[in-house]
Curated annotation (Swiss-Prot):
Functional summary from the UniProt entry: An accessory protein needed during the final step in the assembly of 30S ribosomal subunit, possibly for assembly of the head region. Essential for efficient processing of 16S rRNA. May be needed both before and after RbfA during the maturation of 16S rRNA. It has affinity for free ribosomal 30S subunits but not for 70S ribosomes.
GO molecular function: ribosome binding
Protein's name in the database: Ribosome maturation factor RimM
Signal sequence residues: none
GO process annotations (BP): ribosomal small subunit biogenesis; rRNA processing
Family: Belongs to the RimM family.
PANTHER family: RIBOSOME MATURATION FACTOR RIMM
Free-text comment on this protein's domains from its UniProt entry: The PRC barrel domain binds ribosomal protein uS19.
Assembly notes: Binds ribosomal protein uS19.
Classification via HAMAP family: Ribosome_mat_RimM
Record has rRNA processing as a keyword: yes
InterPro entries: PRC_barrel-like_sf (IPR011033), PRC_RimM (IPR056792), RimM (IPR011961), RimM_N (IPR002676), RimM_N_sf (IPR036976), Transl_B-barrel_sf (IPR009000)
Taxonomic classification: Bacteria, Pseudomonadati, Pseudomonadota, Gammaproteobacteria, Thiotrichales
Cellular location(s): Cytoplasm
């Protein structure tokens, strides 16, 4: 499929003998995951997204599990361990002009207003109050709060972010 997909979850280890698998949501909540509609799966070591035939998604305590259709034992389920679950990009809500999806920030180069490089965004830590950009440059790692106060500009098309931040903050 040539559509762009957005990863919303990752499948972990098998959970029960009947083929249930651990599901690790990449969204804020299971309710958000369920609201996206049709899910697709990308098996490990492939670049192909296929429509997912899920039987059920279960939440027990703070864990989430998925049962795939026609998978009835742990041995068969093992081939899905580390698979990605995604949705077509068009299924995501339209963002306001000043909003971005955190996943779109990954891979952006980050420089400050003095043109000092902080490297590339490799991860984002969600603190509850705001996101924090995790930037890597050579052997250094920089944590930069993702708040309007410090973000001077973003150009996601050219994957560049300019920040009002210094190395010694």
């Amino acid at each position: 499929m040539s559509q762009d997909f957005v990863e919303i979850a990752k499948i972990g280890a098998t959970y029960k003998l009947n083929g249930e698998l651990n599901l690790y949501p990449l969204a804020n909540s299971i309710e958000t995951l369920l609201s996206y509609g049709d899910w697709y799966i990308q098996l490990p070591a492939t670049n192909v997204w296929q429509q997912l035939k899920g039987e059920s998604v279960l939440k027990r305590a703070d864990k989430v599990y998925i049962k795939l259709a026609n998978i009835n034992n742990a041995d068969t389920a093992k081939k899905y361990v580390n698979a990605l679950i995604g949705v077509p990009k068009r299924a995501l809500p339209q963002l306001a002009e000043d909003e971005v999806y955190f996943k779109d920030l990954i891979g952006c180069s980050v420089k400050n207003i003095n043109n000092d490089s902080f490297g590339v965004v490799v991860d984002i830590i969600e603190t509850g109050a705001n996101g924090v950009l995790v930037c890597k440059e050579d052997n250094s790692e920089y944590l930069i709060p993702y708040v309007k106060q410090y973000i001077v500009s973003e150009d996601l098309n050219s994957k560049k972010i300019v920040v009002d931040w210094e190395y010694d903050y």
